[in-house]
Amino acid sequence: MSNQQQQQQQQQQPRQHPQPHPHHHHHHLHHHHQQQPGQHSEFPLPEGWDIARDFDGKTYYIDHINKKTTWLDPRDRYTKPQSFEDCVGDELPVGWEEAYDSNIGRYYINHIAQSTQLEDPRQEWKSVQEQMLSDYLSAAQDQLENKREMYDVKQQRLNLAQEEYNHLNKLAASRSSLCSSSSSMSRHDPELLRADLMLARERVRQLKQELTHITNDISYTERGMNTLYSVGEKINARKNGCYDIAEVQAIREEMLKVHKSLVSGEKVREELMRSLVQIKNELSRQQINEENAELMSAASPFDRVCVASQTDLCGAGEHLNGGARFAEMAKTKLQYAEWRKHIKKLQQQLADHVERIEPGQLESDKDRILLIQEKEKLLNDLNSISLKSRSAEEKQVIQQTRHKLEEDLKEAYEATNTCIANRLRFHEEKQLLLDKLQEALKSTKLLEERLKSFSSESTFSISSGSSLGSLSTASSKSALSFTDIYIDPFAVGESPIDVVDLQRRSQRLFQQHQRLPPVHPALQQQQQTQPLASSEVSLSPRSSLSMETPPASPMKYNAVADQPQAQAKLKEEPTYANALPALPTIPAPPAYAAPPAIPLALAAVRAHPYDLDSTVLDCMMLEAKLQKLNLGSPLNLNGPLSPISEKPSLLDLPQEMLSRSSSTSNTRSVSAAVSNESVAGDSGVFEASRAHLPRKELAQVQIGLKYLKQEGVLVVSLERANNLSALWTATTDNSQVYLRAALLPNSLTSIRTKALSDFQKPVFNDTFAVPISLDKLLTKSLQVTVVSMTGQKEEIIGTVQISMAEFNPEDSTLKWYNVLSSKFIPSFESLDLPSTSAAAAAAAVAASNSNNNNSNTNNREESSDESTITSSQTSTLTRNQAPPLELQAQIAEELPEHVRHNEQQCSDDDDDDDEEEDEQQLVGTLGLTHSGCMLDAYLENMKQEYADKETNTDCAFPPEKLRSQSQLLDDRPVKRSQTFTPSAAVSKNRYNCRLNRSDSDSAMHFGVTPHTFHRGAVERRSLRFQPKATKSVTKLHHNHIPRTSLDLELDLQAQHSKLFFLNDQISKLQNLKEVLQKACDNKDPLIAAWAIENEEFQRLVARADPAKFPEERLLQKLLMKTTKEIHKLRKTKVPKGAPDLVSFKEKISFFTRKGMSVPELPIEFMHPDADAIEEEEEDDNDDEEDNVVETAIAINTALVASSNRNKNLSEHHHRSTDGALSKLAATLTPAINPAPVSAPIPVAVSVPVAAPLADEAKPEQQRYDYVVDRNYGVEV
């Protein structure tokens, strides 16, 4: 083709496809994406065309020949595909353009058809949505039919109950019993007859109330289905089924107005509910007499608890010294990090689990099971009808009805077991994950409180809203998100319907009448396993709790009766039902095998936050870290320790140190300390090694305690001992040993055992009774001393001190206690210390005596403990092998250097951030721990020793006076901190410098930041001063999930539905408040009894009860945030550009999901003159028999009709679709009219449920007032 012919063809193209003339193109405010002129620079413009720009830089083209302007480049016809079939990748055909609006998002312009639309024309998502909507409406129609059938069956039950009541009423009036269906006793006893009459009356009232609930459910479902039908019809009526941008903007503005009304209406609802709480409390006070009223007012939820008289209100770590406090803080932070990881994992599992359960399917399954239960109850009612006085025709009708019901129940059970068995299993797994998530949030909140208590003396702070990995989901968008519209805050955290329990109960009811085929194996196993109490669950069938270790003692009298049953329960395998929710198993991180597990009871944590010594725990953590860091051989912890505590505080215990049994009863527990023979971390089975319990370097005493309340006597049993030779080496063969015990302080008497010559395994078996009141006992400490006797000379060689503050008088205990050697206690007369003494005091004394006694010997056979004398422990955990003072500085000096060396090697690897954090957490724990065992074992692996650098200003080391003990080591090299320079040369004496840290140094995030030291760096400052991250600006080309006009219309109708039901709830709450207030003023006992006993009303007021603990309210907020986080996680799994099927299913199921219900008072309370039961006239005795026949025939007819309905659901669905628009005027909410949307909801004005609209015939097109330009977009 020649150039002249090509130019002629280019000149003819605009004439063949004339572009429409744009009007007021300078009013276009949207940012368009189009081919720039530079992209067609190799092709010249056709003759007669020109390029121009408007005031905002938008390029347009002028056709001088036809005197028109257009946005389309005339050269696009040669460079762009001609149709969607020719497009490759993200291309658009000629005539289409993609644009972006800051409020709406992406939209598309069709210049050829002169229209705009929200949908991407390249995707078929709209047709998929329409098919999903049609499928859901069909399923919802089935669900509605189940509800209607349930209504029919319950109506027949009501007729039978009404008939029985009228029959008993006649008997009570006539005192005759010819045709009575009651027992022979009540036929002649007027009192029993009146009791039967009252029961029948109550049964009729209950059935009427249930009928009212079913009616409300049916109306709610019908209204939601009609809304969905109308949405579908409205979208199909549009051209191409799409809204243009003008309508999209108007709908968005309307949604924002509705949201404002919802916010104000929710405030009104909360205020009404708080008023109902006050009225309910007042009615409760009126139900009791004046004496009890005073007691109730004292326990009023509105009273404030005074804590001025309490003495222990300090933080969790204030009673510890500086070193122990920082060690505890480091461990707590490590636990907090592990719980955060566990929460993230649970969120991911829940996000994965949502896709396995269809939205709305649980409600449908519940209706099926409830329908089966109603038919079972109807069958029972029919079986209870007496046939003695019935005619042959009546008997035949009743028996046919029974047979029909039995056949229906058979079919229903078979369908239920095959259809919903897997769904119920998925639902149960989801509930288990939700329970674990709730408990994990509680645990995280507890740890945050502990960290905040530590920050009372330090600059560290933590906030759930500003910390890394926070659950905060605040969005910078002004538009409403999916969670804002479709997630009800009142429904989050609420206990959902236990459909599995309904299924089991219905099966048990039906099995009373007929044996069914075997149930699905999963459900059958769930039925056989019953929940156990938390104190009776064992996670291993071979749990060592079921055996005696060591054999039983005299202290086990009165405690043998329940042992076989308890052991049988302990051997049961755990299931979903009996798994302990309070101790969720946290998966161990790759490099750290000791994840935390803490108790969730607030009282337990606050009362005894340090029930166990942390020294051995730090040793175990050090051993794991040393193995990872390759610093040396594992620490020699000498096997497992003895079972010394049966109810430990699990807050400080890593997972691998916990017993595999969760028993909290006072059976003998077995230590789960790490040893070479422990397989608890691998197989879940832990067997105690008896051969390793008595070690040469471990001295122990077995002590039993029991309190007899009636006699007021404490029974102390000194049973036996192990390895007392480790405390003292006998010089002669006639040495003996005995035990002496006394209650301190102010003990006037003491008790002692017989003297024995066996120091290895002496068996005393002496029991003593000490008269003492319980109040005084809890303030005492039991001190047991080990005394050696050689001839006439006696010497105290060890002691055990037990705080009675934690003794449980309800249980008997038998425990092994470590014995503290006398070498570490300067004077045993001074053991009568206050019960709040800390572990560090004993540690300092132990270190001092260790240096004096062991400076020239290698004897390490002392069996002692640093922190025996503490109030928060019932026993000791560790053996004290205290090192010299300078060794503590050596480990604080050497280990950080090694860690810094590792950090330099791993600084470029992003995957090692968590590992570096664990290493620094370890450094903070090690440098501040007084564990002699740890230091001695580490000393054996050290190759070079350094002097004390003295850069820590806290009390991490023993007092200053003890430094003279180590002057002989001054020739060692001095290693100073790199953050200062000495002002004088280092002399032969040790150079000690104490550094006062600056603000940026002391306020750093303790042991978490993996960065190298930079003074004043942002990472070293407290998180409370960290500036907030700037909000990210929405980019033009972002990965988005496609939205359609159907999505937009569903969002709008969902907002209107929420507003409608909120108005209805406010109206009902106002009416309920008025009635209850009048009853409160008039002191009506009936209404007061209803308010106290009605479960639905109690659940309602519990939502807004100010007596609810702040922790529960905060938990609700965390659950709401977590729900949003789960939704975001699920959205991230959707492929790029793919539609979110699950979210759309949740949208359409929202309209048939019932929200919060407000209870209604019985009609007899509202209208006292009206009788709730319609009594029959007694003019003819034959009417009763006719009614029975009519009832049975009606039941049979209803059952046949229901089966026919199930066969013709498709026809009914089409009929419902055709009649949906005709029903719309009577069923849709007033929120369709935009008039009430813009105004806030007043307190006293509400929209009734069935209130007709005066202007409902107003056409919807008048809702939008726009001037639409087909080329440019829209002028609003």
UniProtKB/Swiss-Prot annotation:
One of its GO terms (molecular function) is kinase binding. GO terms for biological process: cell migration; negative regulation of organ growth; positive regulation of hippo signaling; regulation of DNA-templated transcription. Residues 1-47, 521-554, 847-882, 898-921, 950-980 are annotated as: Disordered. Residues 697-817 form the C2 domain. Residues 906-920 have a biased composition (Acidic residues). Residues 137-219, 266-298, 327-455 form a coiled coil. Forms a complex with Mer and Ex. Interacts (via domain WW 1) with Ex (via RXPPXY motif). Interacts with Mer, Sav, Hpo and Wts. Residues 1-16, 524-546, 847-858, 866-878 have a biased composition (Low complexity). Pfam families: C2, WW. The keyword Methyltransferase does not apply. The gene is Kibra. This is Protein kibra. GO terms for cellular component: apical plasma membrane; cytoplasm. Residues 18-34 have a biased composition (Basic residues). Residues 43-76, 90-123 form the WW domain. Its main location: cytoplasm. Keywords: Cell membrane, Coiled coil, Cytoplasm, Membrane, Phosphoprotein, Repeat, Transcription, Transcription regulation. Belongs to the WWC family. KIBRA subfamily. Regulator of the Hippo/SWH (Sav/Wts/Hpo) signaling pathway, a signaling pathway that plays a pivotal role in organ size control and tumor suppression by restricting proliferation and promoting apoptosis. The core of this pathway is composed of a kinase cascade wherein Hippo (Hpo), in complex with its regulatory protein Salvador (Sav), phosphorylates and activates Warts (Wts) in complex with its regulatory protein Mats, which in turn phosphorylates and inactivates the Yorkie (Yki) oncoprotein. Kibra acts synergistically along with Ex and Mer to regulate the Hippo signaling pathway.
